[in-house]
């Protein structure tokens, strides 16, 4: 769990914002949402494979767009 130290004369809102940012960087909320319900191993593999395919297609489209602009 992210820990922040409240600085002297620091407003509560600023400290809360820093805490939220550190939680977001650590990925706590996404982890909680992911673990909210049990996911079968086959469903997890399927989800991860779909994400990998999506990342690959996105990378390919970015590379193709770059090539078009260079010529």
From Swiss-Prot:
* Gene Ontology terms: cellular component: ribonucleoprotein complex; ribosome
Source domain of life: Bacteria
Where is the stretch described as Disordered? 37-71
| Pfam family of the protein (one) | Ribosomal_S21
State the Gene3D superfamilies in the record: Ribosomal protein S8
Tell me which UniProt keywords the record has, alphabetically. Ribonucleoprotein, Ribosomal protein
State what protein this is by name.
Answer: Small ribosomal subunit protein bS21
* Basic residues composition-biased segments: 45-59
